[in-house]
């Protein structure tokens, strides 16, 4: 579908230390990603087979490397990390609807996975939950579709992924609209199921459920 292909880029963040995840990530991505899109991995020095790879080198912060990747993306970005192993099918028709709704409702970021700790504001005639300007995790690395210009605005070059969620959220909270609480126009699809398995936690610690997921998907241990 040319509509989605021209508007959406997949951006995957990684680093050399996470190379043991790449084969499993690729296996799951190729199995479950049903869209014809440009798929970019931003790493450090090592290419990821099967993906367009941008390698700024070592010595740069995660945020600086991601911003270089974002420069190469289209207007809308499906932004994930390499420890998110897809676990269910992602279809083109769904993303077409998401992009159409993002444009119709002037959405800056649409989170399309379940999440905890967020609070919401109401908005008439919009099918999604609007995350309050003062919510925890108004910035989240849960799978989301980002407007490119907004992602460039809120992702600072010195951030790590955890800084992006925590410090980035704090910046938006401090600068939010105290009355309407809707300045940032960040939303979540409240009906979206979880379609991925988070393989590791901070510190490269395997997440609970890894053994079961590995067996189900016939993956390799790492």
Predicted features and spans:
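Alpha/propeptide regions of enzymes that mature by internal proteolysis
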Residues: 170, 215-222
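Short, flexible, basic/aromatic active-site loop/helix in glycosyltransferases
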Residues: 122-136
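Catalytic core and acceptor-binding pocket of nucleotide-sugar-dependent glycosyltransferases
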Residues: 138-212
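N-terminal anchoring/stem segment of glycosyltransferases
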Residues: 1-76
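Short beta-strand-to-loop acidic/aromatic patch adjacent to the donor-nucleotide binding site
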Residues: 75-87
